[in-house]
Curated annotation (Swiss-Prot):
Pathway: Amino-acid biosynthesis; L-arginine biosynthesis; N(2)-acetyl-L-ornithine from L-glutamate: step 2/4
Official protein name in the record: Acetylglutamate kinase
InterPro entries registered for this protein in UniProt: AceGlu_kinase-like_sf, AcgluKinase_fam, ArgB, Asp/Glu/Uridylate_kinase, Glu/AcGlu_kinase, NAGK-C
Site annotation Transition state stabilizer: residues: K29, K238
Primary location group: cytoplasm
Keywords: Amino-acid biosynthesis, Arginine biosynthesis, ATP-binding, Cytoplasm, Kinase, Nucleotide-binding, Transferase
One Gene Ontology cellular component: cytoplasm
Gene Ontology BP, a term: arginine biosynthetic process via ornithine
Gene3D superfamilies: Acetylglutamate kinase-like
Subcellular location field: Cytoplasm
């Protein structure tokens, strides 16, 4: 009997959050181990399907860095990185487009199997993500200048769940590879999303990354600005994205451990949450 009561309590705990976030846009940046491990992948798809089916409006932006690197190696296309960003010449950009399209359609298939009306897009579709070149040294890596959010708003209105591959184009129809974190942040800002969640390979934001007891469960925007200069590496970039999002219309940003099963549900629908909440 006790285990049934515990299950009931879980549902009761989730109820106020389901009510609070009903019809709200939730932007999920999907990447890291949660994309590479089949069991974790299935858990993430279940979480997102449940978010959709209880009335939230999720949108997925996915990465694919390791798969792109593997395909480049297989095809003999040289991979080069500068400051953590892939240098994308025309050959690399073509490989990235191919790999991301394949990942995108697999995600659509997974969510369709869970009863969700999912639709796959890349940033070139309908000029969803309009770009300019980020840096001459990075070749076809783009910075988003405009998100044509009307496309996404209409899809959400028709009960679709958009899944977006981070490929964009410029005014001359050149194709650009876009950092998936940047794409997720730009789309969340354009839609003034209720939440932006980054699935990562870390438990969240640490005050001192070498001290695993320094995990920050919640941090205000002002505190995040003070902490940002003290953080190094990839998490510094991610925290800057969190600050940018919160300053431009996104209510809350979450840094979650994608290696934990059902981390999205644990963060959104429980009192304690998991990971770091910014904002």
């Amino acid at each position: 009997m006790q285990k049934y009561l515990e299950k009931a309590n879980v549902l009761i705990e989730a109820l106020p959050y389901i009510r609070k976030f009903n019809s709200k846009i939730i932007l999920i940046k999907y990447g890291g181990s949660a994309m590479e491990n089949e069991e974790l992948k299935h858990c993430v798809m279940q979480d997102i399907a449940l978010l959709k089916l209880v009335g939230l409006k999720p949108i997925i932006v996915h990465g694919g860095g390791k798969d792109i690197s593997a395909m480049c190696e297989k095809l003999g296309v040289k991979s080069e990185f500068k400051n953590g960003l892939r240098v994308s010449d025309k050959a690399t950009t073509e490989v990235a487009s191919m790999v991301l399209n394949h990942i995108n359609k697999n995600l659509v298939h997974s969510l369709q199997n869970l009863g969700v009306k999912a639709i796959g897009l890349c940033g070139k579709d309908g000029a969803l993500l309009e770009c300019v070149k980020k840096d001459e040294n990075l070749a076809f890596v783009g910075t988003i200048q405009k998100v044509n959010s009307k496309i996404l708003e209409e899809l959400l209105e028709k009960d679709f769940l958009p899944i977006i591959a981070p490929i964009g184009m410029d005014e001359n129809f050149n194709t650009y590879n876009i950092n998936a974190d940047d794409a997720a942040c730009a789309i969340a800002k354009a839609l003034r999303a209720e939440k932006l969640a980054f699935l990562t390979d870390t438990a969240g934001l640490y005050e001192d990354f070498n001290d695993k007891n320094s995990l920050i469960s919640k941090i205000s925007l002002e505190q995040a600005k003070i902490l940002a200069p003290k953080i190094e590496g990839g998490m510094h970039v991610k925290l800057k994205s969190c600050i940018d999002a919160c300053e431009n219309g996104v209510k809350k940003v979450h840094i979650l451990d994608g290696r934990v099963k059902h981390s999205l549900l644990l963060e959104f629908f429980t009192d304690e949450g998991i990971g770091t909440l910014v904002g």
